[in-house]
Amino acid sequence: PPNIQLTILVGNYAQHYYLHQKSSTKLTDTVKHYRDYLPDYFPLVHPSPRNNIWQAKNPWFKKELLPDLKELVQKILSQ
């Protein structure tokens, strides 16, 4: 069987489906509380140029979330 250690959930649809969320759950809230879904899931915004405004309004994304994601992926790949 595959050794899946992390599932990255990109965007609202994936997050609502895998996290069994109500459709009213806001993407920003889910992504901001990404630690609540670890170690199995890591919710992210879609990497689209249209999200540049969202990223500008949410500086924690680049300051906290991305370094945590990089560290986690490096840890998994080094095993």
Residue ranges and their predicted role:
Residues P1-Q79:
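Glycine/proline-rich loop-helix segments at beta-alpha junctions forming the active-site rim
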